[in-house]
Amino acid sequence: MDGRLANTWKLTVNEKKFIETALASNLRIDGRNPLEYRKITIKFGREDGSSEVQLGQTHVMGLVTGQLVQPYQDRQNEGTLSIFTEFSPMADPSFEPGRPGESAVELGRIVDRGLRESRAVDTESLCVLAGKLVWAIRIDLHILDNGGNLVDAANIAALGLSLNV
C-alpha cells in the first residue's frame, strides 16, 4: 500500500501497542488466522460496464463509461483513461460527503498508476481514427464500506471494469 494513504490515519500509542501484541499472539480483530485471506466476491452488473467487489467487509461498486473525443495533440493515436473515486459517508466516519477528500484523490491515483503501469488498458487500442477520434474511458469507483484492504478492492473493481472495455 502506498505510504501516503496509510498516513492519513494516525495511530495512538495504545493502538500501536495493541497491534504489536496481536501480531505477536497471531490474532486478528476479525477472527482470521494470520495467513487467512478475506473472502472475495466479484459481480458484474446486469448493465454493461458495472461491477461490484466485496473483499471481506469492504464494498466497492464501479462503473465504466466511454465517449468518443478528439485525441490530445501529443498523443494522436491514444485514447484516455481516467479514474474517479468517491467515498460514501457511510463507508467510514472520517469520510465526508461532497468534494473528494485527500484519501479519495490518493486512492484514485494509486488505482490509476496500477492500471497504467500494468498496461491493463492499452490506450493505443482506444484509437478509432488516428488524429481524429479516440475513446475516453472513465472508471468511477464508489466506496460503500471500508472494512480493510481498500486499495486491493478498488484495484480489483477497476481491473474488472477495464477488462469490460
Where are these regions (language model features)?
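Poly-acidic low-complexity segments
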Residues: 30, 122-124, 149
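Glycine-rich, flexible beta-strand/loop modules in the N-terminal catalytic cores of phosphate-handling
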Residues: 41-130
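A generic structural motif
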Residues: 89-96, 141-149
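Short, Gly/Pro- and small/polar-rich lid/capping loops
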Residues: 1-54
